[in-house]
Amino acid sequence: LRCTFGRTVK
């Protein structure tokens, strides 16, 4: 899980 552009992506 990483945070990209303020959204959470698995």
Curated annotation (Swiss-Prot):
Main subcellular location of this protein, as a coarse class: secreted
Official protein name in the record: Unknown protein 5
GO cellular component: extracellular region
UniProt keyword annotations, A-Z: Cell wall, Secreted
Organism this protein belongs to: Pinus halepensis
Localization (cell): Secreted, Cell wall
